[in-house]
């Protein structure tokens, strides 16, 4: 019983101390404050006598401020007495929304770009025009043209350079600005090439080395269009970026354009992937116009079997030779051959599958949405875009025709005849161009099987477009 009484007495004492502590602290602070005021008054008295008397207006303003309502933050708040207006609140909300931006100067451009993005989404989803990349590009275009979203800021990359000081500050930098760094620094296209290499079989090219010439011939369209773009008033860097469309290689076009003419990137990317999707429409008329029915019926012998040793040596040898002769092409060629070596060596199957699937898919999403983000109204809605689309199809047509013409020339000196249709597969739209050669060949001769023969020039075109990009980078100073 005594212990219980002792416990309650101690508890009561503790409560009294807790209650009294703030009061004691206030008393001590008040005493200290009075001492400080007295000391301050003694020091400031001589100075106050020298100063003029406070104007009456300032005294009245101070009195008003003293009697003003106090906000929750302890500061005078004159607006707290004002009656809340629902109409004003709705007006303020509408002014902050993006709807108003469509009715301001230049707002119609954003609306038009949104319509273009809807059209591209339709082509990708319904018509299946290169949907794996055209759909992310279209959605990136949609995001960047939503007024007020602030996801992409082209001024951070003005002049073709990354303004790292703005990124360091972090304020005003959107999500797509960070993702676009992968395009600007050339990371995404190279990673795409690793995946392409892991999915490519160079066996038909190794079995028939002459098909390398057909792949090289198809790149003539790049340089013909380069000259044509110069004639139309584009500068050297812009002409080089436009010409690469003729290679029908999206990652290469994006890689080169991001280096030479980044302001043309959205138009060139859309043109490149659109024309790749239109290979079955563009190529057959050209192939039929340049060949006779007899030439289209030519049957080619079955290719020899290529050993695993040859498939392992090939990517290593190609990397060494091209990197020494043309260092500017080393990033693309090196990544392409790295992926192929993973596939062919037989000891990195897990890496090969990861590169072909997970890595390829993730990078494709980032690449597409980043490229689409650059398609702002100012960058896309101009006469240059129309010129790029026109020159792009010219480049693609010249590339397809050049391969067919070289195959016809080779038949003049070769004992074993080559079906000229496989020459059009020299553009690097893998494997669509090879399938078109097979389809047109079977229309003339149902028993003709050209697919594997056409795959030789087709994969050679992948190497050729990367080499052509390296040549342009070497001759055009950044």
Each PLM stretch: what is its role?
Residues 4-7, 16-106, 154-173:
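Low-complexity, proline/glycine-enriched hydrophobic segments characteristic of transmembrane helices
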Residues 107, 205-226, 376-403, 454-458:
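Entry/N-cap segments of selected transmembrane alpha helices
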Residues 274-347:
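Membrane-embedded hairpin module used as a gating/binding unit in multi-pass transport
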């Amino acid at each position: 019983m005594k212990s219980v009484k002792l416990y309650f007495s101690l508890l009561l004492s503790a409560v009294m101390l807790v209650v009294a502590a703030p009061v004691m602290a206030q008393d001590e602070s008040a005493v200290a404050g009075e001492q400080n005021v007295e000391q301050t008054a003694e020091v400031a008295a001589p100075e106050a006598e020298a100063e003029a008397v406070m104007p009456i207006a300032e005294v009245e303003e101070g009195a008003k401020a003293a009697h003003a309502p106090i906000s929750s933050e302890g500061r005078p708040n004159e607006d707290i007495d004002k009656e809340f207006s629902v109409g004003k609140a709705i007006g303020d909300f509408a002014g902050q929304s993006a709807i108003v931006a469509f009715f301001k100067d230049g707002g119609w451009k954003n609306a038009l770009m949104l319509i273009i993005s809807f059209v591209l989404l339709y082509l990708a989803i319904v018509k299946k025009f290169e949907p794996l990349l055209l759909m992310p590009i279209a959605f990136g275009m949609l995001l960047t043209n939503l007024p007020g979203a602030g996801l992409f800021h082209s001024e951070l990359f003005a002049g073709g350079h990354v303004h790292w000081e703005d990124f360091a500050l972090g304020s005003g930098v959107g999500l797509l600005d960070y993702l676009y760094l992968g395009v600007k620094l050339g990371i995404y296209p190279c990673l795409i090439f690793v995946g392409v290499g892991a999915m490519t079989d160079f066996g038909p090219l190794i079995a028939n080395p002459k098909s390398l010439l057909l792949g090289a011939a198809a790149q003539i369209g790049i340089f013909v269009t380069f000259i044509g773009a110069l004639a139309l008033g584009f500068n050297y860097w812009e002409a080089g970026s436009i010409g690469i469309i003729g290679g029908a290689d999206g990652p290469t076009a994006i890689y080169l354009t991001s280096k030479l003419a980044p302001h043309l990137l959205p138009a060139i990317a859309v043109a490149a992937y659109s024309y790749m999707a239109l290979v079955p429409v563009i190529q057959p008329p050209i192939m039929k116009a340049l060949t006779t029915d007899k030439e289209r019926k030519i049957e080619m012998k079955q290719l020899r079997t290529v050993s695993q040793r040859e498939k392992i040596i090939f990517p290593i040898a190609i990397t060494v030779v091209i990197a020494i002769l043309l260092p500017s092409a080393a990033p693309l060629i090196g990544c392409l051959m790295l992926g192929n070596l993973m596939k062919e060596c037989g000891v990195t199957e897990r890496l090969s599958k990861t590169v072909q699937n997970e890595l390829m898919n993730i990078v494709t999403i980032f690449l597409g949405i980043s490229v689409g983000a650059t398609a702002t109204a100012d960058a896309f809605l101009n006469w240059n875009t129309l010129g790029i689309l026109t020159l792009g199809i010219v480049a693609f047509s010249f590339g397809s025709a050049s391969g067919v013409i070289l195959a016809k020339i080779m038949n003049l000196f070769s004992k074993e005849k080559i079906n000229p249709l496989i020459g059009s597969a020299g553009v690097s739209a893998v494997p669509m161009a090879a399938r078109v050669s097979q389809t047109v060949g079977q229309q003339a001769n149902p028993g003709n099987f050209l697919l594997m023969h056409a795959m030789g020039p087709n994969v050679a075109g992948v190497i050729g477009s990367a080499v052509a990009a390296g040549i342009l980078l070497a001759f055009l100073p950044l």
